[in-house]
């Protein structure tokens, strides 16, 4: 059995955790946690240490321990602040340890059966702070909110802007 140095194990865990943080990027994030409640790099490292041989390319599949830690972190990394923190941990590890393959880190969720994982390639130059931004819902065009758009010379134009139109469809005919 080969032993892994603590610094290498820490790097792996950090990288995998940041990758898992991407899995919840598409969903709307809840409010940021209270200060001090987000995952620490140490917590992430301990959970994902078994993934190190896989992301270094020394094993063809992640171990059961790796998948267990990855699934747990995927479930716990929900807020934008947690995603930003995990990303920054991964970037630090990737800058420190050159033997970690970012492509393999991105494959951990797929190999471990983590559904809806949409991990982009992990890059040491990405702006992690963008992971904390919640996407906005698109606004309806004014024409759909206030009825047809008319020009300023139309007398109904001002009335439409002041009073939104609500159209109710007629009731369906009753069957005899």
UniProtKB/Swiss-Prot annotation:
GO terms for molecular function: lipid binding. Residues 155-165 have a biased composition (Basic and acidic residues). InterPro entries: Bifun_inhib/LTP/seed_sf (IPR036312), Bifunc_inhib/LTP/seed_store (IPR016140), Plant_nsLTP (IPR000528). Keywords: Allergen, Disulfide bond, Lipid-binding, Signal, Transport. Residues 139-176 are annotated as: Disordered. GO terms for biological process: lipid transport. Residues 1-37 form the signal peptide. Gene3D superfamilies: Plant lipid-transfer and hydrophobic proteins. Residues 167-176 have a biased composition (Pro residues). Belongs to the plant LTP family. This is Probable non-specific lipid-transfer protein 1.
